[in-house]
Regions:
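Hydrophobic, well-ordered beta-alpha structural blocks that scaffold small-molecule cofactor pockets
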Residues: 1-55
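Structural motif
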Residues: 17, 77-78
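Residue-level detector of alpha-helix initiation sites
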Residues: 25-26, 87, 133
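Short loop/edge segments at beta-strand edges and connector loops
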Residues: 46, 63-67, 107
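A generic structural signal for well-ordered alpha-helical segments
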Residues: 56, 61, 92-96
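Glycine-rich, highly charged phosphate/nucleotide-binding loops
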Residues: 57-74
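ADP-ribose/adenylate-binding Rossmann-like module
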Residues: 78-85, 89-116
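An accessory alpha-helical subdomain
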Residues: 133-225
């Protein structure tokens, strides 16, 4: 069977209810990632979990030591079928499909409607990588290789994050803003930041930014050089 052509997407779960069916090693990884993402409510079902203390203590987490029923899907935006039972996971995925709820099925990705990419994070920057389900192990390998690269780019990401709101406040043409930010990305600014060359960074910004932002240059660079 051909793998789906997945649509990449980042989700804000701060107002969402999610469900994880199964609290084994795989399920606990899903639980940890969901809590880290700030999910509003996370229901975990597992009738066989011997020690609930294995789950993290969190106000958003609700654990129920029982089997899955379709009624558990009420209000859920995202569901993970991560039990050790093929039958249970298939039932969860099928029930989600009937209700149009996104479901990640750990042991049979094609039964679900979404997969979880390998992710690398550095500050506010997140890189998500997938092989389309062909080789999650290789995706993880690539993620590890890219983590160092991401950390090298953090100073420039932070700087651009400081500049952008001030730039937008000038109410210039959208295309002008885009061209200016792209020019900064393609300039020597990243190299100058990595070298902690404050003078060169200041010169590059003064040459590229509108005069209305020049008084902010020192603040933009604060702590980065």
């Amino acid at each position: 069977m051909l793998m789906p052509r997945y649509y990449p997407l980042f989700l804000d779960l701060s107002r969402a209810k999610c469900l994880v069916v199964g609290a084994g090693a795989v399920g606990r990884r899903k639980i940890g990632a969901l809590l880290e993402s700030g999910v509003r409510e996370l229901v975990v079902l597992d009738p066989e979990l011997s020690d609930p203390a294995l789950l993290p203590e969190h106000t958003a987490l609700v654990f129920k030591a029982r089997r899955f029923t379709p009624e558990d899907l009420a209000g859920c935006a995202l569901v993970f079928a991560a039990s050790g039972s093929r039958e249970t996971n298939a039932a969860v995925a099928a029930a989600c499909a009937e209700r149009g709820i996104f479901c990640n099925c750990a042991d049979a990705p094609l039964e679900g409607t979404c997969i979880v990419p390998a992710t690398a994070r550095a500050g506010e920057m997140t890189l998500a990588l997938s092989t389309g389900g062909a080789s999650p192990a290789y995706a993880r390998h690539l993620r590890e290789a890219l983590e160092g690269w991401l950390h090298e780019k953090m100073p420039l990401t932070t700087l651009l994050g400081r500049i952008r709101p001030r730039l937008l406040a000038l109410e210039m043409d959208t295309l002008q803003n885009t061209d200016l930010l792209r020019a900064l990305v393609q300039s020597e600014l990243g190299t100058a930041l990595a070298a902690k060359d404050a003078k060169h960074c200041h010169e590059l910004l003064a040459a590229a930014l509108p005069k209305g932002l020049h008084p902010w240059i020192a603040e933009f660079l604060d702590g980065l050089v």
